[in-house]
Amino acid sequence: MYGERGRNMVSSEFLSMKTIKEVAPHLVPVPIAWGTYETLNDVRFILCEFRNMTDELPDIEAFPAQMAELHRNGTSPNGKFGFPVTTYHGNTPINHGWHDTWEQYFTNTTKVLLQMEQEAQGPNAEILDFSKRLFEKVVPRPLRPLETDGRSIKPALIHGDLWHGNIAMDANTGQPIIFDAASFYAYNECETPRVLFRWSLRAGRTRCVAPALEQDQRALSSSVAQSFPESAARGGL
């Protein structure tokens, strides 16, 4: 990782890993330091403890239980959704800020990511038409009921970029390890909604906030939002 962007990437990953470590000590390698090479003054690094890892996937019950514990115990310092620094999805910056509601956070950050995607790939009338309906109708329908009519959700610390490439097993302890974090305080359902949250529900480690019937729509909205930084960094939707 190079230059100013590389500096921001390693420093935000260090803060993400450090924040997770404070809540779930055994779930991540200990983050030790980040900085710049003395002899390569434009090259950045992040240093974590060595953990002997295997590429096996974790147990379907044990891993969701540990992630659900992270979500329960990782509380936002100001009660809001967001994160104090910009994190990165690959090379794409995610400018979180702080927001009072999950709908507000999701809408604002997704709009910025869509704009970045369009700048990277060029304007696309079909996507722009879709995005108008996405923000006016699709997003409010499953998200707004979470925080209306007396309902509320608590911002939870999440890994932020969880997929099988960022999960391993400790060869010595047999326990799951997660790394390459890009954390923020979110609605916990958005932590890989199609995989981890369903595992957690099946294992009885977390519960689906009412209205439960909208859970699939919320998962789909999160999946759509996650496709924008992928497209901005790579080859299009």
Task: List PLM regions with ranges.
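Short, well-ordered amphipathic alpha-helices
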Residues: 15-18, 140, 209
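Conserved phosphate-coordination/catalytic loops
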Residues: 11, 129, 133, 200-203
